[in-house]
Regions:
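N- or domain-start disorder-to-order transition segments that initiate the globular core
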Residues: 1-41
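Short acidic, Gly/Ser-rich segments with clustered Asp/Glu that frequently serve as metal-coordination loops
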Residues: 54-57, 256, 264-270
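Active-site-facing alpha/beta catalytic cores
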Residues: 66, 79-244, 265-271, 275-281, ...
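Acidic (Asp/Glu)-rich catalytic clusters
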Residues: 40-43, 70-77, 126-130, 213, ...
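Internal helix-turn-beta structural module
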Residues: 304-342
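N-terminal beta-rich core of secreted/periplasmic extracellular enzymes
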Residues: 25-42, 72-83, 89, 120
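Conserved phosphate/anionic-ligand binding catalytic regions in large, soluble enzymes, centered on
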Residues: 48-61, 323
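Conserved, mostly hydrophobic/aromatic
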Residues: 52, 261, 327
Length: 342
């Protein structure tokens, strides 16, 4: 019943030096970050689509998927800004199962955090090099932020992490948009309180230092559905939910009121095929209510090369080994449909 220190891992400074952005990529990122920021602040009316596999399990299939996304981005660039999901850390409800490439660079082998941190950064960089798109990742471990702080354009804080003080304070030091999900209980006030905390300045301990942050005015909400005391999924993407969130925002003095709707998780009951229908309903709510249109900046969708999911040892290329995802054909149709409705 104690910690067993196995080995020291690579530092963020060394990892960034070994695998770094080129000057051209840094310039591209500044442009992309400004475009995403403009959507969150309301300066741009483009629609934000954060889309990709539930978990970024294999570099080749993930990068092939993002290459296809990049072609779709060219097609819909006048209306939609696509941010690929490269989720390298996965929260697990019971602690069991694949926890992401940072834990296990090979899903069938034992955890290796040294290799996992390297694999995480290499995957993000390869996606940037091959597509010019800059990605989103979930901040499961606040101490990992410096390893990818220079390459991410969007961060999500999950339903189980959003109440944690260290997550909130770490977001307050970021310079990119951060989506704070509603907790699994569905409580809007918890989600909004996390935005208040993330938009505020804090002084705290972080990676061996006392640090002070400026606050992140781009922190915003993500609606992902809820689970009641009986374990039943309770969606919160409906018109009434969006209207209620707008009302709650109006009572607070938050910067840049904004919401992303997560079309999977408890909103779909993890029925991946429901995601297009959910997105369609969100788009309709935006169409009939200008206040909702102003608040809801985009959606989050889980998709991959092949539909559904599989066990870790089944080895079907481009198919999720965690939650079920849309396949590419459905993804392409969904992106086209979103563009046609905007």
């Amino acid at each position: 019943m104690s910690f067993h220190y196995r080995k020291e891992v690579i530092s963020p400074e060394v990892l960034q030096e070994l695998y770094s952005l080129t000057p051209e990529q840094k310039a591209q990122k500044e442009i992309r970050d400004a475009q995403i920021r403009a959507i969150i602040t309301g300066e741009s009316d483009k629609f934000l689509l954060i889309i990709g596999p539930c978990s970024a399990d294999h570099e080749d299939s993930v990068c092939e998927y993002i290459t296809r996304l990049a072609k779709m981005q060219e097609k819909v660039e006048e209306k939609i800004l696509i941010v690929p999901r490269i989720y390298t850390n996965k929260p697990r409800t019971t602690g069991e199962g694949y926890k992401g490439i940072v834990h296990q660079p090979d899903p069938e082998k034992a955890p290796d955090f040294m290799e996992g941190l390297i694999a995480m950064r290499k995957m993000h960089l390869r996606a940037i090099s091959e597509t010019g798109l800059f990605s989103a990742d979930e901040m499961l471990y606040p101490e990992n932020w410096p390893y990818i702080s220079d390459i991410l354009s969007y961060v999500a804080v999950g339903a189980r992490s959003v109440e944690d003080q260290q997550h909130r304070m770490t977001v307050s030091g970021m310079n990119v948009p951060a989506g704070m999900k509603n907790p699994t209980s569905g409580d809007f006030s918890v989600m909004l309180n996390s935005c208040i905390a993330a938009q505020s300045s804090h002084t705290f301990l972080y990676r061996g230092h006392e640090v002070t942050t400026d606050g992140n005015p781009l922190a915003h909400t993500i609606l992902r559905g809820a689970v009641n005391k009986h374990g039943q999924n309770i969606p919160n993407y409906h018109y009434e939910d969006l209207e209620r969130l707008h009302e709650k925002y109006s009572l607070l003095n938050l910067h840049n009121p904004a919401c992303i709707v997560d079309a999977n998780h408890s909103n779909s009951g993890k029925k991946h095929y429901e995601q297009p229908r959910i997105v369609d309903e969100v788009l309709h709510s935006r169409l009939v209510n200008p206040a909702i249109a102003e608040l809801v900046k985009g959606v989050m969708v889980e998709s991959y090369l092949l539909p559904g999911s599989q066990k870790v040892n089944e080895h079907e290329y481009g198919k999720s080994i965690t939650d079920p995802c849309l396949g590419w054909d459905e993804t392409e149709r969904l992106i086209d449909k979103i563009a046609s409705h905007l």
